Curated annotation (Swiss-Prot):
Domain of life where this protein originates: Bacteria
A GO BP entry: cell morphogenesis
Function: Cell division inhibitor that blocks the formation of polar Z ring septums. Rapidly oscillates between the poles of the cell to destabilize FtsZ filaments that have formed before they mature into polar Z rings. Prevents FtsZ polymerization.
NCBIfam families in UniProt: minC, PRK00513.2-4
Record protein name field: Probable septum site-determining protein MinC
SUPFAM superfamilies: Cell-division inhibitor MinC, C-terminal domain
Subunit text: Interacts with MinD and FtsZ.
Organism, scientific name: Synechocystis sp. (strain ATCC 27184 / PCC 6803 / Kazusa)
Length: 247
């Protein structure tokens, strides 16, 4: 990038036992109604390295980093470059905050924890039902320590390992074994469900309800669905489930 080209803007703020790193990517208009400025992963890593060298000494070694990118669109190589730049300064990228589904998928696929929030939208008629964001689909196993937070439905094609967690405002579908924590309808949606290919967790959550799973349920090796009834959370084989059974 030449000297007169806009550069990525970084801001690092220590917050307790981690640091928050915000990234803003400027845009330029290359054609009518077509704002764009793409930074390669090498450019992002170099820019971050320069910034961190200026900020050196403001954190302890191995401090965890929460990267806030908001509406910026980043792919896996760019996220890996940011992680590499942080590692050179003894910082560890752990979380990514974004309201772009593509960035959330790239981060989750890289094994990072994800907090996907909805982008700010113009005010609408309060009588209109707010729509959930598109489902977040993660095509790999969620390893221990990984976190997924999403304002809509979450689909995991893989296992959810012990020590990992999924929190969704909508439904959760796990095409694998659930050994970690799953919380559907996190903002009080009692109509949310959790569908699991195989359950090996001790507890699950829907809305504000908590269910402890007995050993007999854990041993069942068939797809199951968890949902709320008038008696609390119920776990039923998918082949026996009827939508009318929901609270």
């Amino acid at each position: 990038m030449s000297d007169d080209t806009p550069h990525p803007e970084w801001q690092l703020v220590p917050q307790g036992n981690f640091v928050r790193l915000s990234l803003t990517l400027p845009t330029v208009t290359t054609a009518p109604d077509s704002p764009s400025l793409v930074f390669s992963h090498q450019q992002l890593e170099q820019s971050l390295g320069n910034y961190l060298r200026i900020m050196a000494g403001r954190w302890q070694d191995q401090t965890l980093v929460r990267l806030a990118v908001n509406n910026q669109l980043l792919d896996a190589r760019q996220l890996q470059a940011i992680a590499a730049g942080l590692k050179e300064q003894n910082l560890t990228l752990q979380w990514v905050e974004t309201n772009r589904r593509q960035t959330a998928v790239a981060a989750a696929s890289a094994g990072l924890s994800v907090d996907q929030t909805m982008a700010d939208k113009p005010l609408v008629d309060p009588s209109e039902t707010p729509s959930l964001p598109k489902p977040l689909v993660v095509r790999h196993t969620l390893r221990s320590g990984g976190e997924i937070r999403h304002g809509g439905d979450v689909v995991i094609i893989g296992d959810v390992n012990p020590g990992s967690s999924i929190v969704a405002d909508g439904d959760i579908l796990i095409w694998g074994c659930l050994r970690g924590m799953a919380h559907a309808g996190a903002k009080g949606n009692d109509q949310a469900v959790i569908m699991i290919l195989r359950l090996a967790a001790c507890q699950i959550r829907i809305g504000d309800r908590l269910a402890r799973v007995g050993a007999d349920a854990v041993d069942r090796r068939e797809p199951e669905i968890a949902y709320i009834t008038s008696e609390g959370i119920r776990l039923t084989p998918v082949r026996q489930f009827q939508r009318s059974a929901l609270l």
